[in-house]
Amino acid sequence: MARYEKQEKKDFVRKNEQIRVPQVRLIDSDGTMLGVKSVTEALYLAKQQELDLVEISPTAEPPVCKILDYSKYLYEQGKKLKDAKKKTAKTAMKELRIKSRIASHDLEVKIKHIEDFLKRKDMVRLVVVFHGRENQHRDLGEQMLHDVAKRLEPIANVEGGLQVTGNRMSMIFVPKN
């Protein structure tokens, strides 16, 4: 453990007696606006309902506070964060390499792997590698990539077309939505 670790700043939410402004814009537990009230009056209303006074928007003028159950509020905030993380796309780039003289059955197996990756919403780069004299027959590799693209057309789009770099020829497949 490092001696001087930076501590993460958690989103600090002021509640009850931690609110130090003279007046707040108050929202009731059912969401109705009660208007601008003094902090002591807002605290009294919260205690009457056996709930907490939580500062929702500290930058507003006057700050917006809501009467609610603080532990339930924290739970809902955590749930919102988890949902937001789930919605962010986690697409990975998978790469499959094949030789230009691959056997037809081996190519079928590779296509099955590509289909599995695409079903998991991953992007796939299919690379044809040329060795030695195979460089003279690049048209075979190009034809193979186009055949694979036609075969995967119902479930994938080709991104960027055919790319050639050195002794490699590649095509990127992106899953259809």
UniProtKB/Swiss-Prot annotation:
IF-3 binds to the 30S ribosomal subunit and shifts the equilibrium between 70S ribosomes and their 50S and 30S subunits in favor of the free subunits, thus enhancing the availability of 30S subunits on which protein synthesis initiation begins. The keyword Magnesium does not apply. Disulfide bonds: none annotated. GO terms for cellular component: cytoplasm. HAMAP family: IF_3 (MF_00080). Monomer. One of its GO terms (molecular function) is ribosome binding. It is found in: Cytoplasm. Belongs to the IF-3 family. This is Translation initiation factor IF-3. InterPro entries: T_IF-3_C_sf, T_IF-3_N_sf, Translation_initiation_fac3_CS, Translation_initiation_fac_3, Translation_initiation_fac_3_C, Translation_initiation_fac_3_N. GO terms for biological process: ribosome disassembly. SUPFAM superfamilies: Translation initiation factor IF3, C-terminal domain (SSF55200), Translation initiation factor IF3, N-terminal domain (SSF54364). PROSITE patterns: IF3. NCBIfam families: infC. Keywords: Cytoplasm, Initiation factor, Protein biosynthesis.
